């Protein structure tokens, strides 16, 4: 099972390939299960800061596809905008970042969020449309209440630790 998991995790586009698409990428970034479609049709309009994690299913839209309904009247119409992601940002699974958005520094974007407007520094956002849920300080306090320190454990040690912590079995 571990080998399958690791194999699936390697299906990512490498940071090098992401840069070759034209995305401007800072240092110490992680791209988890991202592919070419993550960055849309104008990846060169996306700038990502340092220490940013982009998770699977995230989509960046740098254009307004809705202009299609005006194409008969304006055959050449398009509407493009840049997207900026600050430093120390985590973008959760299946989130969508829409054209013209700037996400500040020290931000967590909750899974499934649709980010339609600029996000200030030091907040947790989520929802559709994404809204502030709490400050980064309040989030840190909550996380520390139930934190697990497993980064130095190997796979089996972590498995044993977590199964012991969560012994409840609701189906037997």
Curated annotation (Swiss-Prot):
Keywords: Capsule biogenesis/degradation, Exopolysaccharide synthesis, Repeat, Transferase. The keyword Coiled coil does not apply. Signal peptide: none annotated. It holds the Pfam family Hexapep. It comes from the Bacteria. The keyword Transmembrane does not apply. GO terms for molecular function: transferase activity. Required for the biosynthesis of type 1 capsular polysaccharide. This is Protein CapG.
């Amino acid at each position: 099972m571990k080998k399958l998991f690791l194999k699936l995790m390697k299906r990512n586009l490498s940071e090098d390939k992401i840069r070759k698409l034209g995305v401007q990428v800072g240092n110490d970034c992680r791209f988890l299960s991202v592919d070419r479609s993550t960055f849309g049709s104008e990846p060169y309009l996306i700038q990502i800061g340092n220490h940013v994690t982009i998770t699977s299913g995230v989509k960046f839209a740098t254009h307004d596809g809705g202009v299609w309904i005006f194409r008969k009247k304006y055959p050449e119409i398009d509407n493009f905008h840049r997207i900026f992601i600050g430093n120390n940002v985590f973008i959760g699974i299946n989130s969508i970042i829409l054209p013209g958005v700037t996400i500040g520094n020290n931000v967590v974007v909750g899974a499934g969020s649709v980010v339609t407007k600029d996000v200030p520094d030091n907040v947790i956002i989520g929802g559709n449309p994404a809204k502030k849920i709490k400050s980064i300080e309040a989030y840190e306090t909550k996380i520390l209440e139930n934190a697990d320190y497993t980064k130095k454990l190997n796979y089996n040690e972590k498995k044993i630790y977590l199964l012991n912590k969560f012994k409840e079995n609701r189906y037997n």
